[in-house]
């Protein structure tokens, strides 16, 4: 291997080890403006998009001790390295993809120490986030409490109404 490729391989291996996960993508019809917009959207979730040579990426994966299915890797490939939360990065990729006519195809990924297929990464991206799940739980807990408060309030107003009617009779 040439020295440049060795340095690139080492850099990719470092990114793999530093990241919480990564998503392998095929990109279609990506202009420079799309690429810049995609990179900017990922910066908000502590992730970055890299266009890599297939051979370099798969060699880095192999050297890192991971296994990724490389059978469907035709076309231009890019990798999203997620440094904070890989699920948030996957959600961001899915949102960007919806806004830009499905120009990205999920091929594979590694999220929370699990090797995933492209369909599995996409399914994870469609799940509600932790924040959304917390909001749902709070809503479920708050609904019965507000009903109890309403019932107690109506019971108290009933008692007050009875007392008021008694005082008016006398």
Curated annotation (Swiss-Prot):
One Gene Ontology molecular-function label: large ribosomal subunit rRNA binding
Superkingdom: Bacteria
Cellular component GO terms held in the UniProt record: ribonucleoprotein complex; ribosome
Entry keywords, A to Z: Ribonucleoprotein, Ribosomal protein, RNA-binding, rRNA-binding
UniProt cross-references to InterPro entries, sorted A to Z: Ribosomal_uL10, Ribosomal_uL10-like_sf, Ribosomal_uL10_bac, Ribosomal_uL10_bac_type
GO biological process terms on file: translation
Subunit structure: Part of the ribosomal stalk of the 50S ribosomal subunit. The N-terminus interacts with L11 and the large rRNA to form the base of the stalk. The C-terminus forms an elongated spine to which L12 dimers bind in a sequential fashion forming a multimeric L10(L12)X complex.
Record NCBIfam families: PRK00099.1-1
Function per UniProt: Forms part of the ribosomal stalk, playing a central role in the interaction of the ribosome with GTP-bound translation factors.
Family that this chain belongs to: Belongs to the universal ribosomal protein uL10 family.
Protein known as: Large ribosomal subunit protein uL10
Source species of the chain: Chlamydia caviae (strain ATCC VR-813 / DSM 19441 / 03DC25 / GPIC)
């Amino acid at each position: 291997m040439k020295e440049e490729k060795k340095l690139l391989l080492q850099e990719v291996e470092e990114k793999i080890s530093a990241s919480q996960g990564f998503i392998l993508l095929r990109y279609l019809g990506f202009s420079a403006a799309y690429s810049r917009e995609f990179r900017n959207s990922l910066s908000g979730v502590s992730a970055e998009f890299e266009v890599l040579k297939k051979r370099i990426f798969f060699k880095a994966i192999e050297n890192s001790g991971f296994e990724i299915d490389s059978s469907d890797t035709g076309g231009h490939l890019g990798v999203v390295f997620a440094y904070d939360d890989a699920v948030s990065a996957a959600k961001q990729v899915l949102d960007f993809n919806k806004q830009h006519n499905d120009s990205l195809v999920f091929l594979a990924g590694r999220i929370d120490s699990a090797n995933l297929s492209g369909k599995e990464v996409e399914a994870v991206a469609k799940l509600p986030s932790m924040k959304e799940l917390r909001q749902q739980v709070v809503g479920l807990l708050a609904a019965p409490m507000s009903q109890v408060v309403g019932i107690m309030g109506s019971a108290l107003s009933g008692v007050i109404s009875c007392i008021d009617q008694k005082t008016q009779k006398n």
